[in-house]
Amino acid sequence: HYHLTDFDKKEMPSLDKYNHTIHSDDQSQSSFKPFEENQGSSSYPQGQCTWYVDQRMKQFGQYIHSNLGDAHHWNNRAAREGYQVSSTPKKHTAVVFEAGQLGADTQYGHVAFVEKVNADGSIIISESNVKGLGVISYRTIDADDASQLDYITGK
């Protein structure tokens, strides 16, 4: 039911080459970290995109409200909870695909995690449940498409 990969580049981006690329806007001052499931609880169903983004943000000391609901609700509900929501891509934020937007599920939408913002405005994201439940994958979203999405900064 997802058609998200219809909108990305066909080759998987290599995150290893970014290990030594730290920009001044990188607040974590750390290189790429492989995904590790947080041992704490999550209110999001395991393997879903919402679960993954919740877990991935915790790896970088960013926390997202535990009851934002389906992916396409995250931006509006996060704004009501006092989170910064912007249309400008930023590293280590949640990116929200509205229901049906850029191939996202037409009922639930989709969320992913921004690993890197490239100089040309494209973004590299990591996500779960695009290639199968609990399967973590990476892709590049071009600058034009990235500018249509909302980004949530954790607390």
Indicate where each model-derived feature is located.
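Aromatic- and glycine-rich peptidoglycan recognition patches
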Residues: 115-155
